[in-house]
Amino acid sequence: FVPIFTYSELQRMQEKERNRGQKKSLGLQQRSEEVGSLDPTEAAEEEGKEVIKLTAPVEIGMRMNSRQLEKYRAALEGLLSEVLLSTQNAAK
């Protein structure tokens, strides 16, 4: 399954990710203000414990007409098989 997104859908997804990032940074800022009364060494240790988790894999979509699809079919099949192989190897 290869998802195909329009440009406006990609923009919407990017905007959602930016909003999530802004909310997270605001939460971190509020926490750091609350923790501000701690010893500076404790604050540094607290910063070192932060873990960043990715919420979703990156997806790229494109549109092709039938002529373009015929022209690039072999290359697309090769890319797809590489991705599927690497996914299967990572799952093992």
Swiss-Prot record:
Entry GO MF terms: hormone activity; motilin receptor binding
Main location: secreted
Chain segments annotated as transmembrane: none
InterPro entries on file: Motilin_assoc, Motilin_ghrelin, Promotilin
Domain of life: Eukaryota
UniProt KW keywords: Cleavage on pair of basic residues, Hormone, Secreted
Pfam entry (one): Motilin_assoc
Subcellular localization, as worded in the UniProt entry: Secreted
One Gene Ontology CC term in the entry: extracellular region
Chain spans, region Disordered: 12-49
Xref: PANTHER family: MOTILIN, PROMOTILIN
Entry function: Plays an important role in the regulation of interdigestive gastrointestinal motility and indirectly causes rhythmic contraction of duodenal and colonic smooth muscle.
Family to which the UniProt record says this protein belongs: Belongs to the motilin family.
Name of the protein in its database record: Promotilin
Source species: Equus caballus (Horse)
Organismal lineage: Eukaryota, Metazoa, Chordata, Craniata, Vertebrata
